[in-house]
Amino acid sequence: MGANIRYSNDYALSLASKNGHIKVVKYLVSKDANVTHDNNYAVRYASENGHFEVVKYLVDQGADIRDCRDYAVRFASENGHLEVVKYLVDKGANIRALDDYAVCLASVNGYIEIVKYLVSQGANFRADNDYAVRFASENGYLEVVKFLVDQGADIRADDDYAIISASVYGHLEVIKFLMSQGADFRSKNNASIKLAIKYKHPEIIEYFLTQCTDVNTDIINIFYAYLTKLASKNKTAKLVEYMNIFCHIINKYDNCVKHLMP
C-alpha cells in the first residue's frame, strides 16, 4: 500500500512548496495533490519565502494568488522578493490589500526596490498615518526614508514619531535627514533628547547639542534628572555608565555646555 500524499490536508505539498522543492511539488501534483488546499497554503507560503519557480508552477496549476486578502503579494513584499511580487502583480494581485500592507512592510524592512515598484503601481505609501516613513525611520533605512519623503510622505506624522523612534534606536543619519526636512526633535516635551539619553546614544546627543543654544540647557537638565533618578534607585553601574557619557560630552563641548552645569 502506497503512502497517502494527501494526508493531513495535503501537508506534503504545503511543506514542499514552502521550502521551494519544485521537483517534489511537481511530483505531488502529478499524483493528484490539491494545489488549492487550506486556503491556497502552498502558493501563499511559496510566495512568502520567495520560491519563484514554485509560485509560477502552482499558479499554472490553478492556485489562487489572491486568497486570504492577497497574502501572497503582501508577504512577498514584506520579505523582499521583488521577482515574485512583480509576477503576482502581473497575475492580478492587489498590492493595496489590507490598508496597503505591502508597501508599508516593504518600507519597514528596507526593501527599497520593492517600495519603488509598489509606489509605481499605485500603492499608497501614506496609508495608516504614514506608517511607511515612520517605521522605515525607526529601523534606520535612510534610502527608503528619502524616497518616501521625495514622494510626499509626512515625516511629522503621529507627533514626530519618525525622529523620536530614530532617536531610540540610534539612527543618526536618519535623524539628520529628518531634521533637514523639518522634523522637530523638541516635540512631545523633548522626547527625542530624553530617549537618546535613556538609550545611550552620545553621538545623537552631541548632534542635538549643535542645533541651537537653548537645547544645551535642556539636554543638561534632562541628563541631570536622569542621573538623579538612577542615583535614587541605587543603580550604581548604570549611574557610572551614564556619568561617563555625560563627562565625555561635557569635555567635547566644553565651551557650549560647561557654564550651564548647576
Curated annotation (Swiss-Prot):
Recorded superkingdom: Viruses
Renumbered ranges of ANK repeats: 8-37, 38-67, 68-97, 99-127, 128-157, 159-187, 189-217
UniProt-listed InterPro entries: Ankyrin_rpt (IPR002110), Ankyrin_rpt-contain_sf (IPR036770)
This protein's UniProt keywords: ANK repeat, Repeat
Protein's name according to its UniProt entry: Putative ankyrin repeat protein R848
Source species of the chain: Acanthamoeba polyphaga mimivirus (APMV)
